[in-house]
Each structure stands twice: as C-alpha cells, then as structure tokens.
Amino acid sequence: MDFEDAVRQVREKDQRYSPQAYDLVRLSLDHAQKLIHGEPKKGKAMVNRHVTGPQLLEGFRQHVIETYGPMSYQLLQNWGLKKTDDVGNIVFNIISTGLFGRSAEDNLEDFCGVYDFKETFLKPFG
C-alpha cells in the first residue's frame, strides 16, 4: 500500500480532513525526522527515525510557515486542520492502515492542545 492508497482507505470512513491535509502531515513528518535525526544516509538500511508527537508538531509548524507563510492559517482551516489534535488524528488514521508505525509510548494525547493555530499561523503575519 502506498500513501495515496492509505489516504483513500482512511477517507472512506473519515472525511474530516482533505487529502492535502494528509500530504501536509506526511511532509511535516519528513521535516521533523530531518530536524531530529538529520538527513537520511544514502545506501544505508532504513533505521528507526521515530519522532514524538511534540517533535512532529514542531516540524509541522516550521514546514507550514516556511512553505505557506501568510496563507498558512487559511489553508489549514480549508483543509480541516484547526488545532494540533487534528494533526494527531491524521497521524493515527494513517497508523491504523499500517503505513506509519508507532512506539508503545505514542498516543493521541501527545498532540492535544500543544499550541494554538491562530496564535502560531496567523499572528506572526498580522
């Protein structure tokens, strides 16, 4: 199963978030992994590049602001992402397909109320 298949499978049951929201979280996960673990080494077997919920949310924050700037808040709203809990819901939706892994310590509460979207994605550009 590839990422697009996983998103289709999830969205058959849960349409709260647009496909773009899922892509954004996937790209943010890549960004967070690079922040925490550095660039992946070419030719090396995949090693555990796990990040925690708060680490992923920091990667999400940086990626969104760098990519979308002043449009960040409105795009997130349009795609169904209104709070950090929504990022966690997307992560756990993809985990449920088996495409993303998780550690025993990972839980949805790691994503709850970590920061305010309006404060984070709108205020810096106001």
List each model region and its residues.
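Non-transmembrane, aqueous-exposed alpha-helical and coiled segments at domain scale
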Residues: 1-126
